[in-house]
Regions:
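Non-catalytic beta-sheet/beta-sandwich ligand-binding modules that flank or precede catalytic cores
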Residues: 1-271
Length: 271
């Protein structure tokens, strides 16, 4: 139930002592971090003890000290047995914080990286996390990194095919002794991410003072762009045959520009 110089998670441990010869009595086992609940009994040439940890988390050792074992002639061991030590850990890790975030600006979209930063109550092994967006599994491979033994970051890159909607996740982990967290972490202590992979389009381009594919006679033209959704910045208008004298400004959901022809007679386009 225990690995030497590592961990054990058993509620009781069975300690087996193997002497070099037949003994005249049960050897004395010295225990730190626990108590002997069943005294040693001979099993063939071995002696078997049951040891109970003193607490849920305990550094433990067992050893047969000098003089702790004697043969039938009364000769005692002049050297202690190997000191077998381990850490008893019966406490499962818990989550202290779970922070969901995304790189970039605003909602997540193609090539942005979604991260879940996990801070458990103790050092843990690499977690296992899954991510969904809009209820469907995200296409990217989850990768893991650490900022400390008890702080882990799970990352997934947004794919263009990922479904629009809120990002959900499920993460589990185990401590270094192998104790699993009681239940998966499915809610963030802070942060939320929404995937928006819908590419905006310009649904209408209107030019006041001109007829498309015909003529215009204004000294300046007012160009109004209507996008398919709210934009995060003013769209770039390209003009041939003229210059933008007033940069685009938002007017409700539209963007308005003032364009001046380069000369008195000019073929013009805006796009």
């Amino acid at each position: 139930g225990a690995t030497e110089d590592a961990y054990g998670v058993a509620s009781t441990y069975v300690v087996t002592i193997t002497p070099s010869e037949t003994l005249g009595a049960v050897p004395t086992l010295t225990v730190t971090g626990g108590t002997i609940t069943t005294a040693g009994a001979a099993s063939s040439s071995d002696y078997v003890y049951t040891v109970t940890p003193s607490s849920a988390d305990e550094a433990m050792t067992v050893v047969v000290a000098v003089g702790g074992a004697a043969d039938s002639a009364g000769n005692t061991n002049t050297a202690a047995s190997n000191n077998f030590g381990w850490t008893h850990d019966a406490t499962a890790p818990t989550s202290t914080t779970a922070v969901l975030a995304v790189g970039g600006t605003g909602n997540g979209n193609h090539a942005d990286v979604v991260t879940m930063t996990l801070d458990p109550s103790e050092a843990v092994n690499t977690p296992t996390c899954t991510f969904t967006s809009g209820g469907a599994a995200m296409a990217g491979t989850v990768t893991y990194s650490t900022s400390s033994p008890d702080s882990h970051i799970a990352s997934v890159t947004v794919a263009d095919a990922d479904t629009n909607g809120a990002v959900a996740f499920s993460c589990t982990y185990a401590d270094l002794a192998g104790n699993n967290i009681a239940s998966a972490i499915t809610s963030a202590s802070s942060g939320s991410v929404t995937i928006d992979n819908t590419h905006p389009t310009i649904t209408t381009v209107a030019v006041a003072g001109a007829t498309e594919d015909a003529y215009g006679v204004a000294s300046t033209y007012v160009v109004t762009l209507t996008p398919s959704e709210t934009l995060s910045a003013v769209p770039t208008l390209t003009v041939t045959g003229g210059t933008i004298t007033t940069a685009g400004a938002a007017s409700n959901a539209n963007y308005v520009y003032t364009v001046t022809p380069s000369s008195a007679d000019e073929a013009m386009t805006v796009v």
